[in-house]
Amino acid sequence: MAESRMNLMTAKEAARYLRVSMFTLSKIERVGGLVPYRTPGGHRRYSLRMLNRYLNNSRR
């Protein structure tokens, strides 16, 4: 994982950043729109770069 831990967001933070619900965030993941990093405990983490890339691609 090359991203700095300071640039990683939790699922809740990522959903808020994207202005979607947690359910919608999960749907985006299921269809391959986002592939989050996983912590050793299995928690999802999203980089700001990943989220911005998704936003830019979804606007096209």
Q: What do these predicted regions represent?
A:
Residues 12, 48-49:
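Structural detector for helix-capping/boundary residues
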Residues 49-60:
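A short, Lys/Arg-enriched interface patch at domain edges and termini
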Residues 1-27:
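Polyanion-binding surface elements
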Residues 18-45:
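Major-groove DNA-recognition helix of helix-turn-helix-type DNA-binding domains
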